[in-house]
């Protein structure tokens, strides 16, 4: 049976893992990393780039590069590229396709099934959008699972003498906290809470705002409308945030960030950990209420917790660790890389579903209450939050006016008392109700939540047997027919997309080789004769003139020629430098090679057209 992979579809980075030899293993990306940046870009030539290659070119292509798409899952959001709108599931699908391709390369065969993780506090619309993304990527999403639950799996906590565990997950774009009860291989989530709009991106944005405002005050130059400058600042902000987790201050240096007239201006700022903690104090404060809510819902105190697990890259920050320690009165555990722990847990759950991991049972919960709108605009709950899933519950309702022959049923998710303040999941009408005085008809409304946390709703008139089911469509606007079309498009274009990616990667390789070649040529100036360096200069010029429509064969030839000729010139330069050092050591004066001459290893020079010693 083909392996089921586990995917952590993250806001900043994503990861994929699989059970291999009985152990969960992170699958490396094609570029050699363990994490894949959750970045998708479209080049001006129409190629789609994903991951590290997309992130590398974002400075020169900021307007066509998409970051943090996870924050838009389930929302009515799209990005327009060359006149074509792309929804959040379509962009996320590009990331999932990349992870799937990396997994296939690692496993040496096709991959069609996956477990995909989501924040515990994701709504039904967000979960549906994630499932759609998987389908568009050509994956059968066998389970949508909450990230904190997979973290507990990764730690193998059911095998230890632990009973109550709290998972505290602060990632790139979302925050979750879950309380789990463990015993005899059973992982039961007792309560969950969180904020799907809080994460590392918000810390980055505070640094960005500080840099932009500070630069405007100091230089009188606004940078907000300069897409390239803002992308440079965002990348610098993220680097600074990461560095301040391990050092007390960092230097942010962005030369030529702007100009006043013809005079370039540079951004040079020192940022301390104390400054960052001060400017983000309110963000950190926002994690406190969801943490206390989850504990109250689970009816536990800090003393009841056997272990606190930290998940997510932002939990490396000392301020975060200190806050968690203060909240619970005990230090958290961070033995597993917080950026990889969710993918590892997803692989274990995939192993459970494939029968590779025995004696483990997951009992997850729904993060928000589900119900319908009733008379007076009230939200009537049918399934309350933190109910263990899968679950089915029914309630009986009646009509509000005499001789009512139909009822509109509005399906909602949330915790507010009024219907208008909650998340609308769908609406449908049950007709054919037998005319009667109000309060007489009996209408049974049933809510089903499956193991993926996805909702199915039906209504039935008990007297007539008439029944209707709601089609819960995510706010992303993708109906099943659209998803099917996108799946077909992705499958039909997979080979073409692979070739486009190869072309894009080759172009980037050629750009890197040209940069290296120009550096070599600059270093060789005055040292090597033009007969040695001219082929490299010609190759660089030829690469610069490459037409936009150049094919794979032409690009490979260009790249190989550039690399080969560069090596030849570098070898000649190495021999020259070695000869020069030897001459200096011997006290012999040296000079740069003249036209048509190249240095010998002993420090002498020989004409390029010099004949052999015997004159033949």
Describe these PLM feature segments.
Residues 1-75, 79-85, 101-616:
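Oxyanion-binding/catalytic loops of NTP- or PPi-dependent enzymes
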